[in-house]
A protein has these predicted regions:
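Long, contiguous ectodomains of secretory-pathway proteins
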Residues: 1-155
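Secretory-pathway extracellular proteins and peptide precursors enriched for disulfide-bonded cysteines
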Residues: 136-138, 162-166
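Regulatory and partner-binding modules of innate immune sensors/adaptors
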Residues: 152-164
Length: 176
């Protein structure tokens, strides 16, 4: 496994052999690189995940609430896949908020939802769960991120957002 460059001034080193990267350069007709800044048009790209990545099975449970530690300094998106044969209200909150301020009514047996990387910045804990009957359901949670390596060899995410086309086989990134 190769270590990735450290994000910002973080002391955390991430080792991975499951990440993919994409390098983009815009060249003029003479082959010289043209620096660019985003404007009102966003640039989108899809980065495939490593096909050798073992996708975890969904977890069968009847627990009402779950806690997820957001332990990285890198901004991440959090993705949920839920299979339930009953209507419920999906709720979530960050850190020590006293009430669940975010909720979604769900009346379908398979539900996908994401919290994008702009919403998780600065948070350390995500609590999510279900309001409704205490019945068995299956769920899976995973994360994604979109980053670039700056001139100081540090990973940054300024101007990059994880998109809704992200799934278990690809990460959707766009510059805003």
């Amino acid at each position: 496994m190769e270590p990735l460059a450290v994000y910002g001034r973080s002391q955390i080193e991430t080792n991975t052999n499951l990440s993919r990267s994409l390098s983009i350069s815009i060249l003029d007709e003479k082959g010289n690189e043209i620096p660019f800044e985003t404007n009102s048009d966003s640039i989108e790209f899809l980065i495939p995940r490593d096909p050798n990545l073992r996708i975890p099975r969904m977890i069968l449970t009847n627990e009402t609430f779950h806690s997820l530690n957001l332990t990285t300094d890198l901004p991440i998106s959090v993705h949920f896949e839920i299979k339930a044969n009953f209507p419920y209200r999906f709720v979530y909150k960050f850190d020590k908020q006293s009430t669940f301020t975010n909720s979604i009514e769900v009346n379908q047996s398979y539900f996908r939802f994401m919290i994008d990387n702009q919403q998780t910045i600065g948070h350390r804990t995500l609590i999510f769960g279900f309001e409704g009957e205490n019945q068995e359901y299956e769920y899976r949670v995973y994360s994604s991120g979109c980053y670039y390596l700056n001139k100081e060899n540090e990973w940054k995410s300024d101007g990059l957002r994880v998109g809704r086309k992200t799934n278990l086989s690809q990460t959707h990134c766009y510059l805003t």
